[in-house]
Amino acid sequence: MKWVKSGVGILGILLTICHAVTSQGHILDITDSLKITFKTLSNFGPRAQSIQNVTIENVGIKDIPDSGWRCYFCHDQLLFPGTFNLARNQYFLRPILDNYVVLSDGFLLEFIKGCMYRITPIPRNAPIKTRDKREFTLLAEQFSVSKYDSFPKWYCETISGGNTEVGIIRNTENLKYVEDFDSSYNWFRIPHDFRSVPLQPQDRFSANHKASSVDECKYKVIPTPVKASVSKVQRNFGTTVYYGTTDTSIRGREKLFKVAEQLALKHNLGLVEITPGLTVNNGISLVVTGNYVERNIPSPDEAYSLTVTADLISIEAPALPGLINGIETIHSLSAWDMALPYGGIKDFPRFPFRGIFLDIASNFPGYNYIKKFLTVMAQYKLNKLVLPMYNNEGFRLQLNDSPRYEFQALHMIGGKRCHDLKEEKCLFSQLGSGPDSSGGYLTKAQMTDLIKTADLLNIEIIMSMNIGESARGAIVPLKQSPHSRLLYDPDDTDFVDRFYPQKDTSMNPCREETTYFYDHMLKQLKDIYNAASVPLKTIMIGSKVNFDQVLNSKYCYASNLNSTQRLMARGNLERNINGFKLNFTKRLVKTAHDNGIKEVMAIDDVFTTEFDAEGNTPNTVYDTKNSDNSTRFNATVTAVHSRYDTVRDERLWKRGDRFAELGYKVILSPPILDFNYAVEPDPDRPGDYDSVIRNISFSKLFRFVPDSRCCNIPNAIQHDCALESDCTTAGAKDSYIGTLGKLDTRKLRSLKDWNELLFPRLLIFAERSWHKSSWEDSFGPHRASVNNITRQLITNYTVPNWNDINNEESKVLGCISRKEKLRLMHEDGLKPYVEPPGARLLGGNTMRIAASTTEDSFWVQASVNGNPWTDNVKILDVNPTDSVRLRTVHPAKAELRSKEVKLNLTSLPTPRERFRKIAQDALSRRIGIDIQRARMPPMPVNPAYRPPVPLPSFDPADDRAPDLAAIAAAHPPPLPPGMPSHMMPNMPPPFPPRPPFGPPMLPPGQMRALGQQAGQALRGQGTALGPQTGQQPMPAQPRGPLTGQAAGTGVAGQTGQQPSTAGQGTQQGLPGQQRGGVLPGQWPFFPGMPAAQFPPMFNPQMQRALQMRGQGQIPQRTQGAAAGAGQSRIPQQAG
């Protein structure tokens, strides 16, 4: 199927006029005069999750003509998602015209490619006069709760005589054109979503914060050593670095010399090799002993011992990696005052693999940043850096493919983005890159230098390739190369990814060109590694095959088949799709092995099956042994376990142990290690989110427990741990070799944003990956039992050792603030995230403010009415009419500061406190209902009967212990089928406070343009959003299970859309991730929470619908009738 544009009749003539644009003014007259304002009105709109308003204003001195120009912008979510054909995987914007949406105020909207859309003024409308405004509304697929969901650099073009001029609309250079998120309409992802409400200073205030002292942090090493004993007596570095080794190889001795030389140069010391009879004193002794005292540890090569006495600073290790770790420890000990304390340290890591996946493909940070990042990784003893060569947004490595230069176009075209619709010179603009050439790539010389640098820091650089989906950065450039073998066939069926709607994003595994490309890339990488004198040991496969493409590609079948034979062959292939997938995976591993690569890493989806008729599921893992017990893969295979969601009741967090049982090495990479998640729910700060995880705080990351495979599961029953029946622990512990943190950079346009999300969370990740704390064993699965008398299900919650957790967390995070953030700024030039201050009003006759900060050694500064900042504020007198702004700042580094926050001088609860109270009320009502039901006799035939939930003691706002009922309050479930009316509590539903203004309303003209009609607000239809205009009452749901449908939200036209669950982030090609999105008719799954087992009181609209049905106000209809009213039947889809 091809993309279709109407070319007949009046509509075709209109489009022809629109595209035959001629310049009626210089581009700057348009881009300097236009002002764009973007506002998310509500995340609860009809037919889509988000209603967004765009205002175009002429702020110039000239009128803007009604034609001759058009503008481009990036929107990462599908606009008008009703035009996406899920069954055929096609995306047409055609409510009125093929491939177009007619917007209000005289504009056409069309989809271009990737995230790019184009708006064109309809000719013969009035020009946009000075100070005139035009507005139109967009319907987006998902909710939007952050300014970083929008992209900068909207730009326009004019065409005159074949010459194109382009320019960026000036006020969209940054995100200031996006208006504030200021109410529950655009804070909430779903009703009662109080965790998404931005924090106010009152929410952050901590009256009893225990600050760490200088003495506690001065010699604190992060990550924490296994054994350490130091005193307050100090000494300097001495005069000489002595080095020696038992390694007789030339490479081993040369590498030790370079390591010792770097240490000597850094501290301006002499350098002497240890020889027999040499007296070693007054300096630093570095000795590789070759003596493995402890072999029963995870990574004996990285063990070391450090001894500091009056005579000598001695570091001994069995191998050079351990010696390098010891050197980083003396750097940490001496960071405060360039002196070392007397004492000793014995240390080794808990995992041999401690890595970071740094997405340099989506947005390229530059060679210098990557080199600096290697230095920071070494400081905190991280030893693996995974770099993607390419994804959909770019190709980032120059290859040495002379003399044919077969793949030269990869970096020349794929390494930059610009306004080139034909993509002959660059990839088309994406992700707010604008019309001018932007991006970059690593040259061969730069890549060689990075590999050398990393090797001296005990870091292995692992390159990741997407041999399957998310490969557009490699596919498109090769179309323009006269010598290359194309990875793209224009005759392929037009099946596209609904989260990246264009078809040339996946390599076809049935074509020999794909295997040739993969083999050539491996050879090129091997040449680069050889130039650095470092062996290429590991490669990573970063995406899986697109099976829609496989089933519809002519290359996957014999060429001489007629239509009937082709249909039969397709059925056979579909039944044997997992055999096809296994053979392709084996071919990838064998090709790597043939190129001398000993280990192949891959996302977990590569080594698991798809659903099929034989009962295979995504939890079915390919065995590393064949049926005759021979080895299936001829290289070491390592699975990156990153999927922790649920697909058709398959708990994918169980995969890890299945991998371990069947002979894989396993790397843990759960969603809690995704650094692209926001630090806190702040719409103004960078960071992503999904339907389950709004943010990953420092505390939450600190409580990551790698050894507990039943925990680290987003929104599990309590403290992210599941029921024992929902997890397995049979996998061999030794098979778990490490952890992998990830940074997806799709929405991060500046290095400032990168640093804010990475630091200091990278340090906390390093702490958990290197050091195992004693309290970690207190985490574990919850156990369920049945009361033999009442037959009620009882859950016995495992309670972690919160006292020890809080004490250690306070020390580690306190020393990160007091010491490590200064190191990042002073030694590395990186500005980490600084938490804003807290404050509250004190009681009494005068208005006084108490301020606090959790950042040890930092000050709180205050500015009243715009006056200069006051330092170190703890108590401040103010007047009721004052405007007070606060920020956290380091007294020695003024640039190390937080964002400014405004304090509302009111004693009323903050929005977060109000919404928390709503959830608490919901919990109380839920508990009350369950207590009543507990007194009733068991009624197994009654589908509405449920056993009570125990009463755990917790704070619903505390992310360490999310409770079943609090989660239910935040995520309203569908209507339980067949709920008897006498079981419904006669009580009002727990509404959130209504915003101070009415719900966003579409003008009738806009509603007609969108194919909608203004309806009547029905009595009893009020919700957290207020009465919704344009909505009709929802027909009653039939008894029995629904087919692939979540309950509607009380309005016609709602398709029950919710985004995917945690672990499905926003970047294809990252370990185990797919772009998070909406599947119509689905609700996100939460472990241990069958949706039909919650009372509809948690869904106000369901409660109202039931009451109205009981009063005869809503007639009961069949499923077919409901579909006719706007609720189309949609097959069940994987989450």
From Swiss-Prot:
InterPro entries, alphabetized: Beta_hexosaminidase_sua/sub, CBM2/CBM3_carb-bd_dom_sf, CBM2_carb-bd_dom_sf, CHB/HEX_N_dom, Glyco_hydro_20_cat, Glycoside_hydrolase_SF, Hex-like_dom2
EC numbers: 3.2.1.52
Gene Ontology biological-process annotations: carbohydrate metabolic process; chitin catabolic process; glycosaminoglycan metabolic process
GO molecular function: beta-N-acetylhexosaminidase activity; polysaccharide binding
Class of the enzyme per the UniProt entry, highest EC level: hydrolase
Cellular location(s): Secreted
Catalytic activity: Hydrolysis of terminal non-reducing N-acetyl-D-hexosamine residues in N-acetyl-beta-D-hexosaminides
Region (Disordered): 970-1082, 1107-1135
Span of the signal peptide: 1-23
Assigned keywords, A-Z: Hydrolase, Secreted, Signal
Tissue distribution: Prismatic layer of shell (at protein level). Expressed primarily in the mantle with highest level in the mantle edge and lower level in the mantle pallium.
Gene Ontology cellular component annotations, sorted alphabetically: extracellular region; membrane
Pathway: Glycan degradation; chitin degradation
Chief place of localization: secreted
Name listed for the protein in its UniProt record: Putative beta-hexosaminidase
